[in-house]
């Protein structure tokens, strides 16, 4: 076959269409709110270390009001289908940032946590911090964006109880069509002929498998058959929410339980299920008029029960005619009546449904069907406890507008697997023609049926998160038009995980100053001083600055009295974030700046001896530095005709600079030898990537009688380019500089050779 190299460069475009028609309910996102909603200026959005009025956000942030959304759009995962409401979020990343070494940061109530351990029914709001200016205060770990989840709190006096139950069916739209045995065998023979090999399957074998007269001797397995899989499985969930309080304290609690089934309908797998029970409690206390405190805690009990064996992996590789001459399950009706030895084996065998025995061959003494029936079961158990508390002190007696806030959290998570591991016997049949029928005349036993009754424990993990932050806040207005706010923050966290020596740590100081004049002209400056133990002493600190400017055109005289424009604002931001989450060489993240020396034994000067020698495996580079995210973004948002149409759009261009390379091609080649395998080459900052794109979220909102209608579309479009690469390949097509980061590279067929002459004049090909 003639072939040529072809590169496929894909540009990502994500668009979602959402249509909501709730009765008497409101769907609010950062871009939408209905006519009966209170002033948008009072709608507060959680961003880094503070809440900001939605209309005062200077771009790069989107928010979803999950509490109201759940009243009309029930979902089961905290980030489920959020790309339908948020431009710039595709379900996996923000503004197309990669997750090669780490992805976006998830915070639940300000603490680094996993998004899958908080149920949608517990969530009040989710903020998507896409722009560098929105995450700069979080430091290095949020360099690829942050998703901030805020749980519900109690606001009402007295007692309020809400109980909700949901049931649903997960229906498989379709299953793959499994190739039949006869089709597979025919095509396999054809493939062997094409390779000038002899055929493996005879015409008689193909006929017997295709005829289906004896599926036990000539199996025709279909892993997606209704014999093994249901068309649907069920999910049941119940939630109780209790909130209330009085003058000095308010509380919110959430009790949730769900059970999820599976598609399997045979063996131990028919009992597969996942169960989760959780309890959350959030308490707000006014200790005095100037001192307020809060306590949040949650406990989660998660269990997943499953049969042994990897069915889906087997379904992707198992041949329909396999194993030869023996289906995984064979009926005892196929044993010849006078095969006494075989019947003696069956008298002590562990039969399935009282009449089927596990079959196989000597080369295949186990299979996934036998595993599911007889190998036992396993259960994954996870327990999580999360606790955080904080206090806010109003220092207005010291300085008007000044306050102090501190936040502490500790989370524990443990998980392990328990299993009953059984062994089983399979029986190898010998077939013969008895009175014109295929019958089993002999059986050979492979393995033993054993059930120890012991429960085994494996895969134990213990994880812990410790978090602390303290901050001074200042917020004041001068002469009714000069609005000034500032924050001085010290924060850090450590996450320890089983089997990892180094903890995932973050420590940084941050400062933010915001000013707006009469909510018309805005300026915001953010600065983070970060620390990373992954770099050499003297190079472990860096400053990450950000500056944003905004202009609310609506408050200008030429738009102030407009009946069309409700609001219109543009903003521009420039940021540089220093990050260490991409300081990695494979699985190694620490001491990459150090040289590595090792020793080994080599040839000696006389027979029977060996000498020890020392060699370098890596050179030193104490100037190894942070990777930098340099970004410029522009945001435009508007509301027209009394919120009939809303639009929030952003343009961004960012450059990720200083990715690591471990074998620089511009170093002399003698610094890297093949034998002995030695290198004096250090790890360097070199490679750069660039992303340019835009996102948007447009909504149409209309109230028709008692029905609020909202129709929206969100989209993200961006291009990627490897702007700098250390490469010195023989062929130009092998180089990646100047090409897309998300390209798919490979050979494209140029067609089949048409003649012997064309083959002779073409280059030699090898793969």
Where are these regions (language model features)?
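Short, solvent-exposed beta-strand-terminating loops
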Residues: 170-174, 416-425
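Short, solvent-exposed loop/turn motifs
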Residues: 112-113, 356, 438-440, 766
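Extracellular/periplasmic, surface-exposed regions of secreted and cell-surface proteins
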Residues: 282-291, 297-301, 333-335, 341-344, ...
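Alpha-helix N-cap recognition
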Residues: 77, 755-756, 761
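Membrane-proximal, glycine/serine-rich, low-complexity loop/turn segments characteristic
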Residues: 5-7, 16-45, 49-104, 111-121, ...
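Solvent-exposed beta-strand/loop surfaces of large extracellular or lumenal domains
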Residues: 126-128, 134, 272, 668-679
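Short gly/ser/thr-rich secondary-structure transition/capping motifs
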Residues: 108-111, 615
């Amino acid at each position: 076959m003639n072939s040529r190299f072809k590169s496929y460069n894909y540009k990502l475009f994500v668009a979602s269409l959402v249509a909501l028609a709730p009765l008497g309910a409101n769907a609010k996102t950062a871009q939408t709110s209905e006519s009966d909603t209170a002033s948008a200026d009072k709608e507060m959005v959680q961003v880094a270390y503070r809440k900001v009025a939605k209309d005062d956000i200077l771009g790069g942030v989107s928010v979803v009001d999950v509490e109201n959304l759940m009243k009309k759009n029930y979902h089961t995962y905290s980030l489920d289908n959020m790309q339908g409401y948020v431009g710039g979020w595709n379900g996996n990343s923000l503004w197309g940032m990669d997750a090669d070494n780490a992805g976006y940061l998830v915070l639940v109530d300000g603490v680094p946590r996993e998004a899958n351990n908080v149920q949608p029914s517990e969530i009040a709001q989710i903020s998507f911090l896409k722009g560098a200016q929105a995450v700069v205060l979080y430091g290095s770990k949020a360099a690829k964006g942050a998703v901030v989840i805020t749980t519900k709190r109690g606001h009402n006096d007295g007692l309020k109880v809400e109980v909700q139950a949901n049931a649903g069916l997960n229906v498989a739209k379709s299953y793959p069509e499994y190739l039949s045995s006869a089709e597979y065998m025919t095509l396999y023979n054809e493939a062997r002929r094409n390779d000038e090999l002899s055929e493996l399957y005879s015409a008689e074998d193909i006929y017997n498998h295709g005829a289906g007269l004896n599926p036990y001797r000539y199996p025709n397995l279909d892993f997606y058959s209704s014999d093994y899989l249901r068309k649907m499985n069920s999910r049941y969930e119940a939630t109780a929410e209790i909130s209330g309080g009085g003058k000095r304290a308010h509380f919110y609690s959430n009790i949730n339980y769900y059970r999820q089934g599976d598609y399997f309908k045979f063996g131990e797998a028919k009992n597969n299920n996942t169960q989760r029970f959780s309890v959350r409690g959030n308490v707000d206390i006014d200790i005095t008029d100037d001192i307020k405190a809060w306590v949040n805690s949650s406990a989660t009990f998660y269990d997943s029960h499953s049969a042994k064996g990897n069915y889906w992996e087997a379904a992707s590789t198992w041949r329909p005619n396999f194993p030869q001459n023996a289906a995984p399950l064979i009926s005892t009706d196929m044993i010849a009546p006078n095969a006494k030895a075989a019947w003696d084996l069956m008298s002590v065998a562990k039969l399935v449904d009282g009449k089927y025995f596990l079959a196989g061959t000597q080369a295949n003494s186990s299979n996934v069907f036998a595993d599911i029936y007889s190998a036992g079961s396993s259960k994954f158990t996870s327990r999580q406890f999360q606790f955080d508390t904080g206090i806010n002190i109003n220092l207005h007696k010291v300085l008007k507008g000044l306050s102090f806030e501190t936040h502490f959290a500790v989370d524990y998570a443990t998980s392990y697997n328990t299993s009953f591991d059984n062994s089983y016997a399979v029986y190898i049949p010998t077939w013969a023609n008895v009175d014109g029928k295929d019958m089993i005349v002999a059986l050979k036993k492979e393995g033993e049926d054993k059930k120890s009754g012991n429960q085994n424990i494996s895969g134990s993990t213990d994880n812990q998160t410790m978090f602390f932050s303290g901050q001074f806040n200042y917020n004041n207005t001068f002469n009714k038009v000069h609005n000034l706010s500032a924050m001085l923050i010290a924060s850090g966290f450590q996450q320890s995980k089983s089997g990892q020596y180094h903890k995932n740590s973050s420590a940084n100081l941050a400062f933010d100053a915001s000013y707006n004049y009469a909510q018309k002209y805005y300026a915001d400056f953010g600065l983070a001083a970060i620390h990373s133990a992954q770099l050499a002493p003297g190079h472990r600190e860096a400053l990450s600055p950000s500056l944003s400017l905004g202009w609310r055109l609506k408050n200008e005289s030429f738009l102030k009295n407009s009946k069309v424009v409700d609001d219109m604002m543009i903003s521009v931001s420039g940021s540089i974030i220093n990050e260490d989450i991409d300081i990695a060489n494979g699985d190694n993240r620490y001491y990459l700046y150090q040289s590595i020396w090792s020793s080994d034994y080599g040839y000696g000067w006389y027979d029977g001896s060996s000498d020890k020698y020392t060699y370098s495996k890596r050179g030193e580079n104490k100037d190894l530095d942070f990777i930098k995210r340099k970004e410029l973004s522009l945001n435009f948002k508007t509301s027209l005709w009394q919120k009939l149409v809303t639009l929030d759009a952003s343009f961004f261009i960012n450059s990720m600079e200083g990715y690591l390379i471990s074998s620089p091609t511009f170093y002399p080649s003698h610094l890297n030898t093949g034998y002995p395998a030695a290198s004096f080459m250090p790890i360097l900052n070199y490679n750069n990537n660039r992303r340019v794109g835009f996102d948007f979220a447009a909504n149409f909102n209309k109230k028709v009688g008692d029905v609020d209608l909202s129709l929206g579309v969100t989209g993200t479009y961006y291009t990627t380019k490897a702007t700098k690469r250390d490469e010195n390949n023989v062929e130009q097509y092998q180089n990646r500089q100047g090409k897309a980061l998300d390209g798919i590279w490979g050979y494209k067929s140029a067609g089949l050779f048409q003649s012997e002459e064309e083959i002779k004049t073409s280059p030699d090909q090898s793969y």
